[in-house]
Design a protein with these regions (language model features):
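A short, contiguous, amphipathic alpha-helix enriched in charged residues
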Residues: 5, 34-35, 660-673
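Short glycine-enriched loop/turn motifs at secondary-structure junctions
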Residues: 17, 72-73, 645-646, 696-698
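A carboxyl-terminal module marker
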Residues: 670, 674-676, 680-698, 719, ...
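Inter-lobe coupling/hinge segments of SF2-like helicase ATPases
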Residues: 203-209, 213, 217, 226-662, ...
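A general secondary-structure junction signal
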Residues: 56-58, 108, 188-190, 438-440, ...
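Accessory, non-ATPase domains that flank or precede helicase/AAA+ motor cores in DNA-metabolism machines
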Residues: 1-366, 378-394, 675-678, 703, ...
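Short, intrinsically disordered low-complexity segments
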Residues: 38, 59, 682-710
Length: 742
């Protein structure tokens, strides 16, 4: 028998160790080791025992055998990486700039091996004649426990484990001896926890209407042809979920499996229940509220083929299905699909890659697709399908834009405009419900004038300046600074500063204005406990409250038929976030918020309160006109050179010593200027991050902008080598983050 060797990646995150090391596979472990297996290996000069993951197995040694170490053992309690996911991890490592072990741990959704709940049965093997001989022998030697068990098995040849251990008082040692003698066998089976109950029964979602069927047929035709990723752009309430389910039925009928990605914030009972009602216990769910062992159980059920549909947030993308057929990405525009830890992968890009590796399909849906996804449709990389009418031809809500500058001029300094207050009173009289949405997304201390709406912005980057405690206004892209202002430079008004109102303050004001109204608040403070999120939504859905106040979590895919009014408070907060995507985020949030109104039989209305009523993000959200928004946003991106009009690489640095970090990031800037070559490559920064310190680590960034991704990839590789040989970076933690075209 020829020798077997394994290429192993060590479980140490270090650029210098980011390669495979070859080990001998001992003969006794040959049958247990395959690509993806976690193993114990001796490593380094001291041969300390560490964990590694096998990437490949072969019969060709790369080094002399007398120099090669051997694998010590298979790590029994560790999860195994599926072979298909190893290839995906290799792509992520190259694409997003990480070590292979970081990429492997990302595609390994759970770090521990699933154990399940083991059930045991004791079955009799010996025939009656031999049993008589054994009983006679046991009596002579006074083996009371064996006599008791054998008599019980003669009466009932298969006994449940608990009966044997608890009722008959039989020890594990006795069972082991009798099993060794061939008298009986211990049958062990594992069952896995199932978070989805079939007790409520199955229902069908109904037949697609003409608009939905046209999209289903169009996507099926695309699958038969180019099989490009498909994007469904459907207005809020158009019935995209039913389209997903029709396509899922086809894939399941072919014996394949489906992954459905839903943002964590929208992963509610109401959303998941529709899939469970249609597909029953073929569905399983994972989410962050589960324990690691609960998530491990669901991944094991997927690997064994016990379930066919995995629903979950970003991490569900790595479900180890044996024959994946379809990946659905609901609310494709959601920012939570982008990882904030290395590797900083995007679920959309990674889903497209996984589908390509496994010959599966990708279908995405959103009322407000990301600009990146729409650009991919424009270039022909994705196929676009539109759903412009609500299901059942329900009318879109009417929208009123309240100019808060005019409210101030009329003496109204309340958080609620006169129009919104008037409409709330009408809804309360008619026993209808109201949602008040505080748009705090991306708020990081921007400064604006309440009289004219002027916002202090960077003259170089067109992003909002951030107020700091040292009296400075700072740009977190390029580092530009200017002194804090006490009067508006545009109109001279003293009413200039940051926006301080939070959901708690709004709740207090609303209760004062409407003392008889039943008010619920939903934010980070009220949803800390495990089930509080569902309890608040269920209470509101049941009509136990008249007004629901909250942040972005209340506008994510919830369906409340009795909600006829939505108030979007302070729409400008996300518009002035320190991010070139601020306009896109604002349009998406406002469109989603407006879409919560009038989803039942009663007509809906939305009031958008803003200091910038003329901004295209506000105007197009009010008109629910995605096409107009996309055109104007792309004009802005092209003018400023932001993705998807260009490629952007962010180099994030963190360190305990602020001066040392600043020096290191300046070294990076100078080195990039020296090697960039192409004049079209722009180096921006270094500058402090929007949140400049977290957990005692100072944070800074340098940005590199270029027309092609290949240019940035080449610069990153050179920079990585420069950092590796330069001792000045040893106390600085660096991350690379690409913002691609699609």
């Amino acid at each position: 028998m020829s020798s077997v060797y394994a290429d192993v990646i060590v479980d140490i995150t270090n650029e210098k160790l980011d390669r495979t090391f070859q080990y001998k596979v001992p003969p006794e472990l040959t049958g247990e080791i395959s690509p993806g297996t976690a193993v114990q290996i001796p490593f380094g000069n001291g041969n300390r025992t560490i964990t590694g993951y096998v990437l490949s197995v072969g019969n060709e040694p790369k080094y002399p055998q007398d120099r090669m170490k051997a694998i010590l053992a298979v790590q029994k309690d560790a999860a195994t990486v599926e072979t298909k996911l190893i290839a995906l991890a290799a792509w992520m490592r190259h694409t997003y700039g990480s070590t292979m072990i970081q990429a492997l741990k990302t595609v390994l959704p759970v770090k521990v091996k699933a154990r399940g709940k083991e059930t045991r049965e004791i079955a009799l093997l010996a025939d009656p004649a031999r049993c008589e001989e054994l009983l006679e022998n046991y009596r002579k030697k006074n083996y009371k426990a064996r006599i008791r068990l054998l008599n019980a098995l003669l009466a009932q040849p298969v006994l449940p484990g608990p009966v044997v251990s608890k009722k008959l008082k039989i020890t594990a040692d006795t069972l082991h001896v009798m099993e060794e003698q061939g008298v009986l066998e211990i049958r062990r089976t594992s069952t896995w926890r199932n978070p989805v109950s079939d007790a409520a029964g199955r229902t069908t979602a109904g037949k697609p209407n003409e608009q939905q069927q046209a999209v289903v047929d169009g996507i099926r035709k695309e699958w038969e042809g180019q099989n490009r990723p498909c994007l469904i752009r459907g207005v809020t309430g158009s019935g995209k979920t039913l389209v997903y389910m029709e396509l899922m039925e086809q894939v399941l009928s072919e014996g394949k499996q489906v992954i459905v990605l839903i943002p964590e914030i929208a992963l509610t009972y109401q959303n998941v229940e529709r899939f469970c009602a249609q597909f029953g216990t073929r569905v399983t769910v994972v989410n962050s509220r589960m324990t690691p062992s609960e998530r491990a159980d669901q991944m094991e059920r997927a690997r064994r083929g016990e379930v066919s549909i995995m629903i979950g947030p970003r991490s569900a993308l790595f479900a180890p299905f044996p024959d994946l057929g379809l990946i659905v990405i609901d609310e494709e525009h959601e920012t939570s699909y982008k990882s904030e830890v290395t590797p900083r992968y995007h679920a959309r890009e990674t889903a497209v890659r996984r589908a390509g590796l496994e010959h599966a399909h990708v279908v995405m849906g959103s009322a407000t697709p990301s600009v990146d996804a729409s650009y991919a449709c424009e270039t022909g990389a994705y196929a676009l399908f539109r759903m412009d009418a609500r299901y059942g031809n329900v009318a879109l809500p009417s929208v009123w834009i309240a100019d808060m500058r005019e409210e101030l001029q009329m003496g109204n300094r309340s958080i609620l405009s006169g129009k919104l207050r008037e409409e709330i009173e009408k809804r309360l009289e008619k026993k209808e419900q109201v949602v008040l949405f505080l748009n705090r997304r991306g708020y990081a201390g921007f400064v604006s004038c309440r009289a004219c709406g002027h916002v202090m912005k960077c003259p170089h980057c067109d992003v909002s300046l951030t107020a700091h405690n040292n009296g400075k206004l700072v740009c977190h892209y390029c580092g530009y600074e200017t002194p804090q202002v006490h009067a508006c430079p545009s109109c001279g008004s003293p009413y200039i500063g940051g926006f301080c109102a939070g959901t708690q303050q709004i709740e207090q004001n609303v209760k004062k204005l409407f003392p008889k109204a039943r008010v619920l608040r939903m934010d980070g403070d009220t949803t800390k406990t495990k089930n509080s999120y569902e309890e608040i939504l269920s209470s509101f859905a049941a009509g136990e409250a008249d007004i629901l106040i909250g942040t972005q979590m209340i506008v994510k895919g919830h369906d409340f038929p009795n909600v006829t009014l939505v108030g979007a408070l302070a729409a400008d907060l996300s518009l002035n976030a320190v991010d070139y995507r601020a306009g896109e985020r604002t349009f998406q949030l406002l469109t989603q918020a407006v879409g919560r109104a009038g989803r039942g039989e009663k007509p809906g209305m939305a009031v958008i309160q803003t200091y910038h009523p003329e901004h295209y993000s506000i105007q197009t959200a009010a008109e629910q006109d995605y096409g107009a928004f996309y055109e104007k946003e792309m004009d802005y991106r092209r003018l400023m050179g932001y993705p998807p009009a260009a490629e952007l690489l962010a180099i994030h640095g963190a360190g305990e010593d602020e001066a040392h970090l600043t020096q290191a990031m300046e070294y990076i800037r100078r080195y990039l200027i020296r090697i960039r070559g192409n004049r079209e490559v722009q180096i921006i920064g270094p500058a402090s991050e929007a949140v400049s310190k977290i957990n005692d680590l100072y944070r800074m960034a340098v940005y590199v902008r270029a027309p092609q991704e290949e240019v940035l990839a080449g610069l990153r590789e050179k920079l990585e080598r420069y950092i590796e040989i330069n001792k000045g970076f040893r106390t600085v933690y660096l991350q690379f983050d690409f913002s691609r075209k699609y």
